Curated annotation (Swiss-Prot):
Organism: Gluconacetobacter diazotrophicus (strain ATCC 49037 / DSM 5601 / CCUG 37298 / CIP 103539 / LMG 7603 / PAl5)
Family per similarity comment: Belongs to the Gfo/Idh/MocA family.
GO MF annotations, alphabetized: inositol 2-dehydrogenase (NAD+) activity; nucleotide binding
Protein name, entry field: Inositol 2-dehydrogenase
Enzyme class, spelled out: oxidoreductase
Length: 337
């Protein structure tokens, strides 16, 4: 069976997923596209999915009989509306992060999904599919380094554009770490603090960069995450987990060490698309496979909600300068199956 997929949002990540489904993966076919800029959708169709229908609205796309599953890759503020439309139509939906830009909308999504009686939503937390993170989790789960005490992490981008704002360091960047650390440690957060080191001169005038997020879990594990989105030298993701018996580090992507002119060097990637390309492939293939036969099995709406609650607390901490509590509802049994 080939799964007919409709894609809402044909910007950078949307086009990358359209290419991925059309050229790199199996079992899926792009049958419909929608974007607020119809020319973007037409260009994406011409390049990657020439048979796809361009829909006037996202709702029209979701309603099409040949659209059996939906991918939401539009601007984050639109995600909740489009995910709710897909749930109402009873169609599996892959939603790039964030699931919604606030916890209240995540709750609406969970309520709608539970009312449907089966899982329909997968959230695009692709690091859970990265081989390095999978190996790191296996080491933690088998107790090799003993009980975890703390985590030191880092998320650096070469540079960001003029539309990037200070709070986006949380809602657009840190949100990946907020999810993957919950998953690695199998635990929830209880508090967050954000501090601002000396500001880099490379940041645009309207933003503060870098930032450091300090998190605590229910088990007392302390996590510090440096977010530096104008680091200049490349795209660099690090994670060091310290346990009672040792330390486990997320491996860097493989690169050939080069010795020349009395210098040892190694290439550093400059784009998230290449750093996590294999994880993206695995993530979308998993969605296609599961949606074709039943329900998605990747990161669920609860994961999206948990990340959103933590992100909300971090944004409050940016503004207040205080340690802010992270308070969630009790996990519904629906998401504990």
């Amino acid at each position: 069976m080939t799964l007919g997929i409709g894609v809402i949002g044909t910007g950078a990540i949307g086009q990358d997923h359209i290419r991925r489904v059309s050229r790199a993966l199996s079992g899926g076919r792009i049958v419909a596209l929608n974007d607020i800029n119809a020319d973007n959708a037409r260009r994406a169709a011409q390049e990657w999915a020439p048979d796809a229908v361009i829909c006037d609205t996202a709702r029209d796309l979701v309603a099409r009989p040949d659209v059996q599953a939906v991918m939401v890759t539009s601007w984050g503020g639109t995600h909740a509306e489009y995910v709710l439309d897909a749930i109402a139509a009873g169609k599996p939906v892959f939603c790039e992060k964030p699931l919604a830009t606030n916890a209240a909308d995540c709750l609406r999504i969970m309520e709608a999904e539970m009312a449907r009686g089966r899982r329909l939503v997968q959230v695009g937390f692709n690091r859970r599919y990265d081989s390095g993170y999978l190996d790191l989790k296996a080491i933690l789960d088998n107790g090799t380094i003993g009980d975890v005490l703390m985590v030191h992490a880092m998320h650096r981008n070469q540079r960001v554009g003029p539309n990037y704002k200070t709070e986006m360091a949380i809602t657009d960047t840190l949100v990946h770490e907020l999810d993957v650390h919950r998953w690695l440690l199998d635990g929830e957060y209880v508090s967050a603090q954000v501090i601002f080191p000396r500001r880099t001169s490379k940041a645009l005038p309207h933003m503060r960069d870098p930032q450091i997020a300090l998190l605590e879990t229910k088990r007392g594990i302390r996590i510090d995450v440096e977010i530096f989105v104008n680091c200049q030298y490349g795209y660099d993701i690090q994670c060091a987990v310290v346990g009672e018996l040792g330390q486990a580090n997320l491996p860097d992507p493989p690169a050939v060490p080069v010795k020349t002119g009395e210098t040892l060097s190694r290439h550093i990637m400059n784009d998230w698309k290449y750093r996590f390309i294999d994880a993206y492939d695995a993530e979308i293939q998993d969605f296609i496979d599961r949606a074709s036969t039943g329900s998605p099995a990747g990161p669920d709406s609860w994961a999206g909600y948990a990340a959103s609650v933590a992100a909300d607390a971090c944004v409050r901490a940016q503004e207040s300068g205080r340690i802010e509590p992270i308070e969630m509802i009790a996990k519904p049994a629906f998401y504990s199956r």
